[in-house]
């Protein structure tokens, strides 16, 4: 079966996708962050970071909650635009 998996690629099962979605909902519930609060947090982070780092692509910032073994994590992916250095 592994030969077929490598040949055609193994797709993620719907049960795994459903489990991940449920974990996301549970983490959001435990931390008490609503989707509106997450969007406000993303907007606030974008504004503050753009003030100090002009090469931030504010529209591409992603904020997610991750469930850890003993601690939940707030993860922010902040892509930076590449700029040329002038010396």
Curated annotation (Swiss-Prot):
Domain of life: Bacteria
Record keywords: Cell cycle, Cell division
A biological process from GO: regulation of division septum assembly
Pfam families reported for this sequence: MinE
InterPro entries: MinE, MinE_sf
Statement: the UniProt record of this protein carries the keyword Ribosomal protein: no
Role this protein plays: Prevents the cell division inhibition by proteins MinC and MinD at internal division sites while permitting inhibition at polar sites. This ensures cell division at the proper site by restricting the formation of a division septum at the midpoint of the long axis of the cell.
Family named by the database record: Belongs to the MinE family.
Protein name, as recorded: Cell division topological specificity factor
Organism in which the protein naturally occurs: Roseiflexus sp. (strain RS-1)
Lineage: Bacteria, Bacillati, Chloroflexota, Chloroflexia, Chloroflexales
